[in-house]
């Protein structure tokens, strides 16, 4: 991958220093009030000052479930890219890349060049970001297999790549992890040979020691902890037990019910490490969220949005956005990896069902023309375990929508999702974006005291099926709204306006700034153009707005 050109915003509102990028930014919104039968809309503007630290830290990543399919695949991906590996396959030679990563393979539009052409740059070029090849990995797993053996067990990567990675991954071994049998399926017992002993309080302290040991031994500036282990059953929120930070810490000391993932979350927060939950269970109970707020530590979740659900968050947005009333969504999955085996247990499946079913809620609520209050589509989710297909998950969806005048439209989609190869770049983005957000602060003219983002990092919603948001905030699931949020906030950090896709420069009769008078600019090679077809309605222009002779009147004789 070629390095991106340096971006320098030439504006009096943007100041570059060796330490920071400081940008003045006007945030424009509207406030709507109801007065009788009138909706009164008032434009508003707030002046922000964003400061982004330019110094990129040495970053460590600790994965809970490091020896699983996702953990071993992400580790292999970073090593393969760092070593610039290539390997033969039956369809030709392949080389390591970061396809599927928003930050590494996505682009953003900077604007128009002197010829009126759009200029795109890698997402990672907008702001100083940790290079993925520089990440340092460690983690925990209830299975004692080293990462090379875990990679072979996962059966995700080509043999030619596994052989080259083997000597680099063989020395990587997960630390013992927490195993509480009642939280995951009974079929996971056979893997559980690498466990932290003791009480819940002792296990919590051991996790904290592991984080401190990794930080010091690897010479790290920061550590981020990410849960990519088994889906757990939901944990009941009980007043007096896990509803406040104090109660949750007391519950751990007493050895009462706390899920393994919540133990890891609490340990991470106490060590001032951001914690990200890649599974669907309610790891971040109210007490954990309060603890994160008290210590100003980022948390994010829940459940990686990688395959079927990512497609759903695009497709339903398209259907409802097109004015079609989607009334039935039926989603069927079968997969054969360890995630599928764990989800074959009813309580663990229920956790997944909840996150996969809520993904269309905001799109339905956005259109009261189509949906009456309380009305929503029928939504059914089925997951089955089929060992033979391994990590190659099959997803089948049927969407049925109502059309005008009583018609119906049914769309059926088959999607083969390479589960871990889709999840690994999402994990990468979560870590890189979270770290970058830790270096951003801002203030407003009315509140000049610098602050950071809310500790519930909802900016990461693009990457989660059931995104956590601060109390009272709207939950957004529509994929392109989520992506625009990330892009436009980062544009604000360098003083650029939000991407609005208007392209008014190309829609004016007399071209505006950036377009030479009379010049027609094509953004891509065009095929040979047919001669203009005379209009049948008396219009005197072709489809491109070029004048043409009036349509001759046909003789009626």
From Swiss-Prot:
The gene is Isyna1. NAD(+) binds at residues 67-70, 141, 177-178, 188, 191, 228-231, 278-279, 303, 306, 337-339, 352, 390-391, 419-420. One of its GO terms (biological process) is phospholipid biosynthetic process. This is Inositol-3-phosphate synthase 1. It is an enzyme of class 5 (isomerase). Belongs to the myo-inositol 1-phosphate synthase family. In testis, it is expressed in Sertoli cells. Highly expressed in 2 types of germ cells, pachytene spermatocytes and round spermatids. Pathway: Polyol metabolism; myo-inositol biosynthesis; myo-inositol from D-glucose 6-phosphate: step 1/2. Residues 512-557 are annotated as: Disordered. Keywords: Cytoplasm, Inositol biosynthesis, Isomerase, Lipid biosynthesis, Lipid metabolism, NAD, Phospholipid biosynthesis, Phospholipid metabolism, Phosphoprotein.
């Amino acid at each position: 991958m070629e390095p991106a050109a340096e971006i320098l915003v030439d504006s009096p509102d943007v100041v570059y220093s060796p330490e920071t990028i400081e940008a003045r930014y006007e945030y424009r919104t509207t406030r709507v009030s109801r007065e009788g039968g009138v909706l009164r809309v008032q434009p508003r503007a707030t002046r922000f000052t964003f400061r982004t630290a330019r110094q990129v830290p040495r970053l460590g990543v600790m994965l809970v479930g490091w020896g699983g399919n996702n953990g071993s695949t992400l580790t292999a991906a970073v090593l393969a890219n760092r070593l610039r590996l290539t390997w033969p396959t039956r369809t030709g030679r392949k080389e390591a890349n970061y396809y599927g990563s928003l930050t590494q393979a996505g682009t953003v539009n900077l604007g128009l060049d002197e010829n009126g052409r759009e200029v795109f740059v890698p997402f990672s070029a907008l702001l100083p970001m940790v290079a993925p090849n520089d990440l340092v990995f460690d983690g925990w797993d209830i299975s004692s297999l080293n990462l090379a053996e875990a990679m072979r067990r996962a059966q995700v990567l080509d043999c030619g790549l596994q052989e080259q990675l083997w000597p680099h991954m063989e020395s990587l071994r997960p630390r013992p992890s927490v195993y509480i049998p009642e939280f995951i399926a009974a079929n996971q017992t056979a893997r559980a040979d690498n466990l932290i002993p003791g009480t819940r309080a002792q296990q919590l302290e051991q996790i904290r020691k592991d984080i401190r040991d990794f930080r010091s031994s690897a010479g790290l500036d920061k550590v981020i902890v990410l849960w990519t282990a088994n889906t757990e059953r939901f944990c009941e929120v009980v007043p007096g037990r896990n509803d406040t930070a104090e109660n949750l810490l007391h519950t751990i000391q007493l050895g009462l019910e706390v899920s393994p993932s919540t133990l890891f979350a609490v340990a991470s927060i106490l060590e001032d490490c951001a914690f990200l939950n890649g599974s669907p269970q309610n790891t971040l109970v109210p007490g954990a969220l309060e603890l994160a707020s008290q210590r100003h530590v980022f948390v994010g979740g829940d459940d990686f949005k990688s395959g079927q659900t990512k497609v759903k968050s695009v497709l339903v947005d398209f259907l409802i956005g097109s004015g079609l009333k989607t009334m039935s969504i039926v989603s069927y999955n079968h997969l054969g990896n360890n995630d599928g085996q764990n989800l074959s247990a009813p309580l663990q499946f229920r956790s997944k069902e909840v996150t996969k079913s809520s993904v269309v809620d905001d799109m339905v609520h956005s259109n009261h023309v189509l949906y009456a209050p309380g009305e929503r589509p029928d939504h059914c989710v089925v997951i089955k375990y089929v060992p033979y297909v391994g990590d190659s998950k099959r997803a089948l969806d049927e969407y049925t929508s109502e059309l005008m005048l009583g018609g119906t439209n049914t769309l059926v989609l088959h999607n083969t999702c390479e589960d871990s190869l889709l999840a690994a770049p999402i994990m990468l983005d979560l870590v890189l974006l979270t770290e970058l957000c830790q270096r951003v602060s801002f203030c407003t003219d009315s509140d000049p005291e610098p602050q950071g983002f809310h500790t519930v990092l909802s900016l990461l919603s693009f990457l989660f099926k059931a995104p956590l948001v601060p109390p009272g905030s709207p939950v957004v699931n529509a994929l392109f709204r989520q992506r625009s949020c990330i892009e436009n906030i980062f544009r604000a950090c360098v003083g650029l306006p939000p991407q609005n896709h208007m392209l008014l420069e190309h829609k004016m009769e007399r071209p505006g700034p950036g377009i030479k008078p009379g010049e027609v600019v094509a953004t891509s090679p065009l095929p040979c153009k047919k001669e203009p077809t005379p209009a049948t309605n008396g219009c005197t222009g072709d489809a491109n707005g070029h004048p043409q002779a009036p349509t001759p009147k046909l003789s009626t004789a």
